[in-house]
Amino acid sequence: MDDAVCTVGLYDASREHSACGVGFLTRKDSRQTHDVLLKGHEALCAVPHRGGMSSEGIGDGAGVSVDLSLSLFRRLTGAALEPGSFGVGNFFLPSDASQHDRASQLVAETLEEAGLRVLLMRDLPVDADDDLGPRAIKAQLPIRQWIFAAPEGLRDAALDSRIHGALLAIEAVAYTDAALDGLYPLSLSARMQVFKGRLNSWEIIPYFKDLSDPDHAVHTMYFHTRFSTNTDPHPSMAQPFRLMAHNGELNTDKKNRLSEAAIALARNKAIVRPRGQSDSCRLDQTLNARVFEEGLDLVTAVVAMMPPAWENDTRLSPRVRAMLEYFSLSEEKNDGPAALIFGDGTIIGARLDRLGLRPLRTVETADYLAVMSETGQIAFPPESVTRRGRVEAGGMIYWNHAEGRAYETEDALEQLAAKEDYAALLGAAQVNIDDLPSADSDLKLAAARYFGDLERPARYVAYTHNQESFKFLMDPMLQSGAEKVSAMGYGNAINALSDNEGGVAKYFSQRFAQVTNPPLDSIREADGMTLRVALGEKPHLGHSRSRQIVVNSPVLRMADMLKIKAQTETPWDRFDILYEPVFGDALANEAALISAIDAVANEVVGFAREKGGIA
């Protein structure tokens, strides 16, 4: 289903940016109590300013994710449930009420086919009183809940995988059948469940009666209150999602989507996305795939998808650097700004992306560990607080309930790096272009070497250089030896309104959410950003047929081009992108251009499938 967002005139919803509120609270002894929900409500009530609200008082969205309460679900089902022996699915029902029964049948049959025996189906009770307001009540979607038993002997990761398969089967129908528009799984898990809606932060706990039920005892809760960013406010795009909640924007989202689609195509699979999917929802969908389809543990997946700025950080140990560099060969970075809360019932944690432009404050007592957007969201008695702090750029903190201990950035990275011999994996997967043998004995000659048939003035024209290019850009740079810096706006005409297309270089631009973020000075930019690029087939799941070549910049020197042509580490090929225009007949010329583009695309795809490498 189309996931494009609305654009009207000059308005583009994908460029909306605001700040959300996120956080988690967990009992360090793993004991389930209702007090966690009461304290969570206190935290949510403290940040109404971090959630958007319409003029009619309707919230952009708020929600919570909690571990499955034994006391509540034992009472509801009348069964002697044990941790890991049952699961819960919460679903928004279709917008068309006449399709509710069909949607319920789809969910129930899919669960049964997966061997997940349904114990109880019910509509989640809500407190739709006058405090919420009639328009806000109308904006909510009904949630139907399924409680199911796990097959005998199927537990832990095997059960998670079975449930995830059922979830994908439901999504494949729900997101592609127009009649079921609106059917959306908030969560389907044997570990956690999600409650959310078009609510304000202070409304979420009172609205869902289960969350106010004294029998609803949990050990972990994480929450989100939303300023609608790159989608219109809608209950399904409220957060948390299934494994995470996210404050910020993902400026790499388009690149991430293209990369994931290409990988899925190479595996003869397809990614089915909900309509109007936000960047945060896409991140959660990818995180679920890494954990439940590729077998990564949650912390490894989070670090691989949102790595620290390791390239210029000399404080990292060699094995941590090797691990992060190995991850970078196959995983596209999800760069924010982004503050991420992640949890699966056993692990609950928080992470900042490499830029660190969103706040995450930590507080710890003898009983609780909490990480939230702001300090003081929960009024812990001062004498009970053992330490306070913050998560720094590229940093993280998480609590492992299986081990009963916290991990912070350094310990977490060292523990992950010790799981594999990443130095050996890295050596087998990549080679730096600087380590390749030189293909030309004279580097100065190589830099000036040209194999085309154009004279120098014609090459200037081909590269769209004119008198202004030399007068205002290149001549000052040649004289000073420094990059030309100016503060004027970019006033060049777009290609459609210009006879001078501008060449490939004109398409290089940086997408950055500068509306809500402070400027980065050159020192911090060097710490947090890199131009490093890996060329060649990604080593996904160990199936790569060749080593990648790592280059320090996407702009290659002629000496680099000669090295790539001479090397035998990875296949390469060149493709003719010229076509013969049809003058005097616009339609025929259009058809010829489309045919030429399709032919080049098919050649490149054929090369990638047969050999893989650099095209």
Regions found by a protein language model. Name each.
Residues 553-556, 593:
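C-terminal accessory domains/tails appended to large, multi-domain proteins
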Residues 21-24, 273, 576-583, 614:
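A short small-residue
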Residues 575-601:
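Active-site mouth loops of central-metabolism enzymes
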Residues 597-614:
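Alpha/beta enzyme core
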Residues 1-547, 557, 565-566:
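Conserved short alpha-helical segments that host acidic/polar catalytic motifs at enzyme active sites
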Residues 86-90, 573, 614:
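Hydrophobic beta-strand segments of well-ordered beta-sheets in folded domains
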Residues 517, 573-575:
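Short, aliphatic-rich beta-strand segments
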